[in-house]
């Protein structure tokens, strides 16, 4: 039996949008694409200029959400992933209540990463430098020789939280 495809009416607000949609539907039906009339070239510096790279990183990785993984990587409490590709060390985990949490992957004492693996499962995150311990909610839970740190406020020294969300199976 042949497959019958029905087209739904689209809510289009302008002639330009209508033309774009019609072109896309025509291209799909004809298994083709629109091609530009001539080969285009741009300056090679668009791809090699370090200043442009810095601008792109500042805009794309600092002002917009980034995808760091799939929810399947964080299916159970304690599972975590790290992400370092944007120049910011990120740690994402699922806490004991099942909520996603994201933090700077940086110990608040001396700046070491508290998770060095790309992914894994942990009950706590421990800094390899001085063994400060953080729970799955990012709270500082312990340190060796706490009597040497009597003047600090442990509540204010948790991992630095970052915004995080789940959309369409992506984190």
What are these model-derived regions, one by one?
Residues 29-33, 37, 45, 60, ...:
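Residue-level signal for well-ordered alpha-helical segments
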């Amino acid at each position: 039996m042949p497959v019958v495809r029905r087209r739904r009416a689209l809510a289009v607000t302008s002639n330009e949008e209508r033309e774009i949609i019609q072109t896309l539907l025509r291209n799909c039906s004809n298994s083709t694409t629109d091609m530009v009339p001539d080969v285009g070239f741009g300056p090679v510096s668009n791809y090699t200029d370090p200043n442009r790279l810095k601008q792109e990183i500042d805009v794309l990785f600092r002002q917009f959400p980034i995808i760091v993984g799939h929810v399947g990587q964080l299916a159970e409490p304690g599972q975590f992933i790290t992400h370092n590709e944007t120049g910011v060390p990120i740690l994402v985990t699922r806490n004991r209540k099942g909520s996603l949490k994201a933090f700077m992957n940086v110990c608040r004492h001396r700046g070491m990463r508290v998770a060095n693996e790309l992914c894994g499962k942990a009950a706590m995150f421990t800094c390899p430098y001085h063994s400060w311990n953080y729970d799955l909610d990012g709270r500082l839970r312990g340190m060796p020789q706490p009597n040497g740190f009597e003047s600090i406020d442990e509540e204010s020294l948790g991992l630095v939280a970052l915004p995080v969300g789940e959309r369409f199976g992506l984190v």
